[in-house]
């Protein structure tokens, strides 16, 4: 289970006071990079869907090869499913290249 976001402490360089800054909260969207760019985009999208569906319900696979070659965003139904997929697939080989799977830093728009 993912814990709720907490505040992380840091020291302000100018005032030397402790400042609370938010810790990034895990989301149900994963950022996948290091995808093999030689594979057809439709084939890659279908295979990413099937791979991530092993860990739960995939709501969306977003890819934009014009702007972000070799990258995709995978939206899972729950944070727990996304977490399981991230832990299980990070570093695994996919079409000959090791996947880099991280939680997306931007908000997901799909519900």
UniProtKB/Swiss-Prot annotation:
Boundaries of every RRM domain copy: 28-106
One MF annotation (Gene Ontology) recorded for this entry: U2 snRNA binding
Cross-referenced InterPro entries: Nucleotide-bd_a/b_plait_sf, RBD_domain_sf, RRM_dom
Any one GO CC term of the record: U2-type prespliceosome
PROSITE patterns for this protein: RRM
GO BP terms, alphabetized: mRNA splicing, via spliceosome; U2-type prespliceosome assembly
Database matches in CDD domains: RRM1_U1A_like (cd12246)
Key words, A-Z: mRNA processing, mRNA splicing, Nucleus, Ribonucleoprotein, RNA-binding
Alphabetized SUPFAM superfamilies for the sequence: RNA-binding domain, RBD
Location, primary (coarse class): nucleus
Subcellular location: Nucleus
Protein's job: Involved in pre-mRNA splicing. This protein is associated with snRNP U2. It binds stem loop IV of U2 snRNA.
UniProt miscellaneous comment: Present with 504 molecules/cell in log phase SD medium.
Complexes and interactors: Belongs to the CWC complex (or CEF1-associated complex), a spliceosome sub-complex reminiscent of a late-stage spliceosome composed of the U2, U5 and U6 snRNAs and at least BUD13, BUD31, BRR2, CDC40, CEF1, CLF1, CUS1, CWC2, CWC15, CWC21, CWC22, CWC23, CWC24, CWC25, CWC27, ECM2, HSH155, IST3, ISY1, LEA1, MSL1, NTC20, PRP8, PRP9, PRP11, PRP19, PRP21, PRP22, PRP45, PRP46, SLU7, SMB1, SMD1, SMD2, SMD3, SMX2, SMX3, SNT309, SNU114, SPP2, SYF1, SYF2, RSE1 and YJU2. Interacts with RDS3. Interacts with LEA1.
Record protein name field: U2 small nuclear ribonucleoprotein B''
Taxonomic source organism: Saccharomyces cerevisiae (strain ATCC 204508 / S288c)
Gene encoding the protein: MSL1
